[in-house]
């Protein structure tokens, strides 16, 4: 997502290949790749299964970590983490301190939700030494090789 995309949380809807924030005021996001594609897929899956759609907290980040730091800070400070049943972390800049603060906040909020690490977030989960706190990693073939090598610091 574009670096100018603000930290935005809440419900989203899918329409014509674009994600729209339920509250409006945010430019629609194309679901062609990345986190918007993951969220679009989750929305379609929930619709098909007839279950409540997820909420999502998104931030623009093109690799310098600014948007990811905002997201980490928001999650670590959020009193609304209690009652969350599952969280999927996807394409966040690998920030060990941010990761660890979020993990501690989740432990304090209890009970621990199901935690899924996908894409780049798997790297920080492994590097932190807390990979066992996660219930599911979803690697592709290259990521799987990295995760299996206990001595590899980065893919």
Predicted feature locations:
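Small-residue (G/A/S/T)-rich helix-start motifs and N-terminal tracts that mark the onset
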Residues: 1-90, 95-100
């Amino acid at each position: 997502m574009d670096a100018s995309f603000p930290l935005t949380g809440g419900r989203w809807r899918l329409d014509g290949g674009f994600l729209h924030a339920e509250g409006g005021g945010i430019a629609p996001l194309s679901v062609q790749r990345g986190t918007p594609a993951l969220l679009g897929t989750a929305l379609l899956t929930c619709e098909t299964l007839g279950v409540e759609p997820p909420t999502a907290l998104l931030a623009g980040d093109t690799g310098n970590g600014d948007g990811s730091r905002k997201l980490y800070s928001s999650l670590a400070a959020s009193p609304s983490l209690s009652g969350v049943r599952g969280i999927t972390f996807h394409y966040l800049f690998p920030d060990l301190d941010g990761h660890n603060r979020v993990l501690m906040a989740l432990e304090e909020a209890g009970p621990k939700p199901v935690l899924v690490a996908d894409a780049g977030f798997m790297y920080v989960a492994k590097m932190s030494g807390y990979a066992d706190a996660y219930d599911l990693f979803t690697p592709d073939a290259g990521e799987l090789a990295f995760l299996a090598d206990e001595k590899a610091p980065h893919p």
